[in-house]
Amino acid sequence: MEDRNRITRLHTLLVVCLVLFAVLLGRMVYLQLWRGDYYAKQSDGNRLRQSRILAPRGIIYDSEGKELVNNLPGYAVVLQKQSSYKPETLQRLSNLLQMPVEEINAKIKASENFYEPIMLKNNLDQQMVTKIEEQRRYMPEVMLSVQPIRNYPYHELAVHALGYVGEVSSYEIEQGLFKNITQGSLVGKAGLEKTYDKYLRGEDGAFMEEVDVAGNVVKHYDSVQPIPGKNLKLTIDYELQKELEAFTDKHLAFLRSSGIAPGARAAAVVAIDPRNGAVRAMVSRPGYDPNWFVHGISSKNWNSINNDPNYPMNNKVITGEYPPGSTFKIVTGSAAFELKKVGLNEPIFDGGFHPMVPTMGNAGGEVLGWLTFIKALAMSDNVYFYELGYRVGIDNIEKYAHIFGFGERTGIDLEGESKGLVASKKVKREIWNEDWRLGDTFNAAIGQGFNLTTPIQLSVMLSIVANGGTKYQPYLVDSIINSDGSLFEKPKRAEGKHIDVSQQTIDYIRMGMSATTQEGGTASYFAGLPKPIAGKTGTAENSHGRDHGLFVAYGPVDDPELVVVCIVEQGGFGSVAAGPIVYKAFEEFFQERGYMPRPDKAAPKKDTIQ
């Protein structure tokens, strides 16, 4: 009986052993056949480490080859990919990087390539690099990676044209807004950095290393070198840009401190070549330092931008929509000449108001008497142009506004351009659901009412006048250059198109604008320049405060090479608020070409660093 029980126990034990063996065998088969790839990756991950070599972004040069944007050497902190991480490691990283653990986990989850380390934070400052190095013995899966850092050496200079870069977001990756991009990469977020990102970004390289359990490198494998991004050569003139920005800031401060315009804190200035549309300078105030975004903008700097009522991040040259004021009289005059509604020397009487709408007259109630076109434009007389508006009619004013480029985007190579608005019966019906009145036509004729324009649109209109009737698409990038200096391509642009306005009409407009800057005109101080300039003042009504001041000009009159448009928000009269900035642009332009001496070229004083 006892032997039988012993045999039974042995049989039971044997069955249990067989079952256990079968389970182990099944598990082994499962791991080998179904989970083999996974554990092979885990094993390789423990000894193989792949890292990206970030491609340096292309350099951005001014028209003369001066570096406006370049790269500096820097560091990023990356995390070796593995199946799980110790909570204390993540917490240590969180404390070091000032990054929530949840954000670190989100980056880990977003990473798809098992062999590629996870980028946690780039553009580290030296203090952060030192702290991480000191803590690495507790975190062997954490590494420092050398990478290029985007650098804007002149800080705010031309920031609204150049833009800035930042780390690509999960949303941008999910939406496919950037091609061939991975988490942790830097991409253009605004300006030319964004428009030409696919050229500037280049192609990242990679290298593979074998490491031991402590993370020490024991073997190097062949690497794939990065391909640098393409370079951009701009049309921007560094010297003109620098002088315009400095003087604009100085002049705005003067307008405020003198009490002339206490609220003058915002402005837009653009200078272009009327012969082809090349932008020579672009200023929008207030501005900001794009370097703030490279290292991850601090809450202090972000609040200083975000809470500023003058919107520093808006490029007012292309997004600001303002009534064109008296600068629009160029359009009204052109329509009247083209439709034979007025003669060049035909006198029209200004008795201080228009008899058909007695409540509408000149600023300050001025009475200028009998006027012909040239004097009316030079004196910026309202009553004269009310009469032209009455003769022409709103439909024709609308037609010629579109001919000169209003109400449509210019096509400049920057994102976010506004279309503006052209006054019309349809627009009033859509906005106010009201019928059109004669007073609306009078307002439209002098650039008020429903008319809205951007400074870049005004520069296109003025270029048409300056060059004799051709409308060009404005642009900032002259050419895209390979890293070896050879030409990659010229950006495609629309060819210049001659507008449907006669040369005679263009000549009449030019005569009136030339008189504006001569004795008796509203901007006679321009007569002090070595070559004659043609200009037009403007005052744009502003329902939220003091009127905006505008000034537009081109020169030299005989052979125009430069068009300048300026608007100073809440600056008051254009001749006082905006005119001096335009004057400075031409002064710098003439000094560069040797037409007048440059004061700062005198012999330097002792102890002066040149």
Kindly give the residue locations of the regions a language model identified.
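Periplasmic/cell-envelope proteins involved in peptidoglycan metabolism and beta-lactam response
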Residues: M1-I297, E321, D395-G405, A527-L529, ...
